[in-house]
Amino acid sequence: KSSGICGSDVHYIYHQHRATAAAPDKPLYQGFINGHEPCGQIVAMGQGCRHFKEGDRVLVYHISGCGFCPNCRRGFPISCTGKGKAAYGWQRDGGHAEYLLAEEKDLILLPDALSYEDGAFISCGVGTAYEGILRGEVSGSDNVLVVGLGPVGMMAMMLAKGRGAKRIIGVDMLPERLAMAKQLGVMDHGYLATTEGLPQIIAELTHGGADVALDCSGNAAGRLLALQSTADWGRVVYIGETGKVEFEVSADLMHHQRRIIGSWVTSLFHMEKCAHDLT
């Protein structure tokens, strides 16, 4: 019924066709139907399926893991280390087609209040932002900084607002993204990434720095900005993919008692929880 196009799709389709260490025999996008953000309705069931029925509206967790490695047991097939790991639309057929063959263990029931388009967003982009919000432990007492206002960054601000964050600050290279965030009502203060002295500006605005900084840019400068703009004892969550970052371990991290957390997509449990939280 619906299948989204992710930023990672654009990156790999146009810039990087390759196999992964987890699936060296299955190069990305080679010989497979694309679409790793699928959401639809079950029209037929295979033998042995017990948890769903024909007619159910479901979203598909976009990685099918082995089901037995420690990460799969934790509910994170995205980090599967076993044999047979394959992403829908990357190493097995995905959602950009009339029908999709999915495994029952990868399905999540779509709440009645949500559309198929909502489900497609949750199956990757919103779920990724949601996990970052959880890892950062965002609450109503927090000043939250989001660096990189693409789809995931926008969703992170939306979710932070939904959790009652005290103040939400956005940073991006593009003024039109800042304007959109302001128009949507998910951002209290916005700055261009080229603004001089941003860490000091954010420190003054928040009386000490962001309690939680979420980098959704995947950019070295963005990651450094997120770290340096975080308050003492604050949490920095790196969500954006690829790239590198360099910083002074003592001056930028240890002496400020800051904590860096890596967050990659989300778990099956949290994706289901995200869907219900959005109703």
Regions inferred by a protein language model and the residue ranges of each:
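Generic hydrophobic/aromatic pocket-lining and core-packing "Φ" positions
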Residues: 9, 157, 178, 223-227, ...
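Short SAM/SAH-binding signature in class I
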Residues: 208-214
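Helix-to-beta-strand junctions that scaffold the AdoMet/dcAdoMet cofactor pocket
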Residues: 230-231
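Glycine-rich beta-strand-centered segment in the early N-terminal region that forms part
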Residues: 1-4, 18-70, 106, 111-113
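Mid-domain Rossmann-like dinucleotide-binding core that forms the NAD(H)/NADP(H) cofactor-binding site
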Residues: 105, 112-195, 200
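C-terminal substrate-binding/catalytic core of Rossmann-like NAD(P)-dependent dehydrogenases/reductases
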Residues: 199-203, 207, 242-279
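Glycine-centered, small-residue-biased loops immediately flanking beta-strands
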Residues: 142, 234-235
